[in-house]
Every structure is written in structure tokens, then in C-alpha cells.
Design a protein with these regions (language model features):
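An N-terminally biased module of ancient metal coordination in phosphate/nucleic-acid-related enzymes
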Residues: 1-56, 62, 66, 106, ...
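Domain-core and long-helix interface of multi-subunit machines
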Residues: 61-62, 69-166, 173, 179-180
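Active-site-adjacent betaalpha module
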Residues: 177-180, 185-187
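Aromatic-rich peripheral "rim/lid" segments of glycoside hydrolase catalytic domains that contact
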Residues: 188-193
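Accessory recognition modules or surfaces
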Residues: 155-156, 163-165, 185, 207-212
Length: 213
């Protein structure tokens, strides 16, 4: 992953493996061992962390706080394998509950349609609590068949533009070839005329400051 990031000219790469709530993914021992990994490989600075799972309507996540000091970056999202969608109100409160968690830096793929939510209070909460929303490229890939993802992400971008809330673009690369792949996002950025200054991907120091690094 670091080699691919270097080849593409990236200065900073975040790697966040799924937390244990998803069957077959990393155990807590994996996260305990992250301290052995160099934080600069092939000239690329690494942020190593976890993609935590929101598991209930309160926004509870599936990894204990004792692990948080071991994680450079902590993102949280709703995943169908460990979250039972409720009403729009319940799902919205679940996501906002995670946004309110001071240990969470980013909400992953909030617009992928796994659970129907109300985006305006989510965007406002992200602004209030200094939590980034991810615009996820993989969710927009037609092969994923996320039928509401395009409209959802357009809504998020329009609201973030309206309220001047920064976002992070995520490739959601599960293989090195997809690192820094944002092809499905670019069309949405153009359609919404989204301000470049609200995209933190190419602002390394601003991003690191945002997440407290």
C-alpha cells in the first residue's frame, strides 16, 4: 500500500482496517501491534488506525477506548454486517452519536445507503463536533449497486458547501491499485461546484491539525 501511494505521489496515507464487529476481520491483537510499524515507508507518512463499526442507535462503537491511544486515526461507520437499520430518526441518531464521540475523526461513507438517514442534522453535527464526513469513491462505483449513493453524496456535498463544512475524499482502497482513486467522486464535485478549499486531501498539515496529529 505504501509503495503504491509513493508511486502516485502521495505524502500521507491512512490505513484503517475494519474493527472486530465485522466477521473475519482484524482481532484486537492486530491493533495492539500497530506500534511496530514504521510511520514512514517509501517516503510516505502513514496514519494507521481502525474503521470502527457503529453497532446501535446510540452510536456505540465496537472497540474499547483502551485501544484508542494505539490508533493514529479513528473512523466510524455503519456496516450491514453489524448494524440493523431502524427508522430514519434512529439511524440518524446512531450516526450523530458517533460524531459526538470525541475520539472519532471521520465518519466513513455516510452516504452509501446502508441505513437511511437525514443528512442535514448529520452535517451540522459534524461541523459542531469537528468530525469529518467522508465522500467515498467505492460507494459510487456502479458494480457496488449502492442505488442511493449518488443522490446521497450529492446531498452531503451540497449541505457541506452551504454550511462550509470540510470533507475528506476516500478511495476505500481494499487493494493497492485503488489508492487515490476518486474517479466517481469528481463528477459530483463538478456538479455541485464544491469549493476546493473544503477538501482536505491535498492539505496535509491542515488535515493533520484537524485530527489532532
Amino acid at each position: 500500500m505504501a509503495a503504491a501511494a509513493s508511486e502516485k505521489g502521495l505524502k500521507l496515507l491512512g490505513i484503517t482496517e475494519h474493527a472486530p464487529g465485522i466477521p473475519g476481520t482484524c482481532s484486537p491483537i492486530y491493533f495492539r501491534n500497530l506500534h511496530v510499524v514504521p510511520r514512514r515507508i517509501y517516503g510516505v507518512e502513514l496514519l494507521l488506525g481502525a474503521e470502527l463499526n457503529i453497532i446501535d442507535y446510540k452510536g456505540t462503537i465496537d472497540l474499547g477506548e483502551e485501544y484508542f491511544p494505539m490508533l493514529d486515526i479513528r473512523i466510524a461507520g455503519i456496516h450491514s454486517l453489524c448494524y440493523k437499520p431502524g427508522t430514519v430518526e434512529q439511524n440518524t441518531e446512531a450516526m450523530i452519536g458517533a460524531i459526538r464521540n470525541p475520539h472519532i475523526h471521520i465518519i466513513s461513507h455516510p452516504g452509501d445507503g446502508t441505513a437511511e438517514v437525514d443528512f442535514e442534522p448529520i452535517v451540522l453535527a459534524s461541523k459542531e463536533h469537528h468530525t469529518l464526513l467522508e465522500i467515498n469513491n467505492s460507494s459510487l462505483n456502479p458494480v457496488r449497486k449502492k442505488l442511493t449513493a449518488r443522490d446521497n453524496n450529492l446531498t452531503i456535498l451540497r449541505l457541506c458547501k452551504k454550511y462550509e463544512v470540510p470533507v475528506i475524499l476516500g478511495s476505500d482502497a481494499h487493494i493497492s491499485f485503488d489508492i487515490a482513486r476518486y474517479d466517481h467522486i469528481y463528477e459530483l464535485l463538478q456538479e455541485t461546484r464544491f469549493p476546493e478549499e473544503l477538501i482536505l486531501n491535498d492539505k496535509v498539515e491542515a488535515f493533520k491539525k484537524f485530527i489532532g496529529r
